[in-house]
Amino acid sequence: MSRPKPIHNAQPEQVFIESLDTEGRGIARVEGKVLFVDGALPGERVWARRTQNHKSFDRAELLQVDKASSLRVSPPCPHFGVCGGCSLQHLEPAAQVAIKQRQLEDHLWRIGKVRPERVLPPIHGPSLGYRSKARLSVRTPKTRGAMVGFRERNSSYVVDMGQCLTLDPRVGQRILSLRTLIGQMQSPQDFPQIEVAATPDAVALVFRHMRPLAESDLQHLRAFGEQHDLQIWLQPRGPETLYPLWPEQPEPLHYDLPDYRLRLRFDPLVFTQVNQAANQVMVRRAMALLQPQPGEHILDLFCGLGNFTLPIARLGAQVLGIEGDARLVALAAENAAANGLADKARYAVADLTQARMEDFAPAGAIDKMLIDPPRSGAIEVLRSLTPGVRRLVYVSCNPATLARDAEYLVHERGYRLRAAGVVNMFPHTAHVESIALFER
């Protein structure tokens, strides 16, 4: 791929915005070439200036909105437009969801040549203060004090921010305090990032550090944790070196799925859904689509901690969860035992980009399946789909790979796309999470 060429001293031009791309940028067409305009909305006529030239498209900065969309709103965050954490705060929240639903359906048809028989109502959660997981960057420029937050849009610089409205407020309202804390360290440049993991009962901050810490640094960190009622964890090298600093024996982090009388424990660095309110509704939706029954044998691929495995087991089915991360599998097994479901839920470690279904599920042994793959999708394991799987629920974080996999399932394996809809897991961002039901 050729590198973009910067455009200097381009003249402003008036353009009409047709739609949004998958990163939340406005799309215009000028003399047959696509122009991406940050901050512009569909239906708007704007003045823009080109900043980058690519072979098939150009990028532009928004200068002025001549005709504003009726869906344009004032962003609640003063850092919007600079911060790369959000891209859609200027769009009315209900319209954000409608655009994501349209993008999902467009991808399914354009890439997969398939349309859902039923469009599911969107799943919502809170739009502010919802982020329970995040990675905050840390920088210490010579001209300013320590910077803590998200990176600037299209840049490696960290935003000069004092708060974050989408983060859990126990962290989002303490950005300035975190900046002060980093500034007190003997070598603040040795802290590249802070991981956030929040639950209703506790918040853990994981400080990644490049060199051994001085005793004064440890004292500052302990005092910060005690003052703000936060768990402080340290990670000197890889994830396996993670350990708690304050308190020395913290209460385990957990989240609940009350509909299924479940409590799932986890470590601060492992994957959990970022929006727990939306996750609870998504799990409920997945169970309604999958309809686990006692006596059925169900496969849960990319199972993680057991977010779907354990509800399936609670509803009476026998379920096998497969995951590539051995630490997640160990936690999932612990969660099954802690919830009294060790006889219903079993787990195994496998690289699902390489494994075949018959490696862990003989032909005819599986009645239904749920998959929750990463952005790359699940085409490798789907190609080895064994006969007998009559119902498949697909939870996706990338509509493009969902559409690709849907094309294979529908046009080559004889499934029907019974239903599909979006999950607004990341409000104010262009991220499209979705859930789909396939049957044959």
From Swiss-Prot:
[4Fe-4S] cluster binds at residues 77, 83, 86, 164. GO terms for biological process: rRNA base methylation. It catalyses: uridine(1939) in 23S rRNA + S-adenosyl-L-methionine = 5-methyluridine(1939) in 23S rRNA + S-adenosyl-L-homocysteine + H(+). S-adenosyl-L-methionine binds at residues 273, 302, 307, 323, 351, 372. It is an enzyme of class 2 (transferase). Its EC number is 2.1.1.190. Belongs to the class I-like SAM-binding methyltransferase superfamily. RNA M5U methyltransferase family. RlmD subfamily. This is 23S rRNA (uracil(1939)-C(5))-methyltransferase RlmD. It comes from Acidithiobacillus ferrooxidans (strain ATCC 23270 / DSM 14882 / CIP 104768 / NCIMB 8455) (Ferrobacillus ferrooxidans (strain ATCC 23270)).
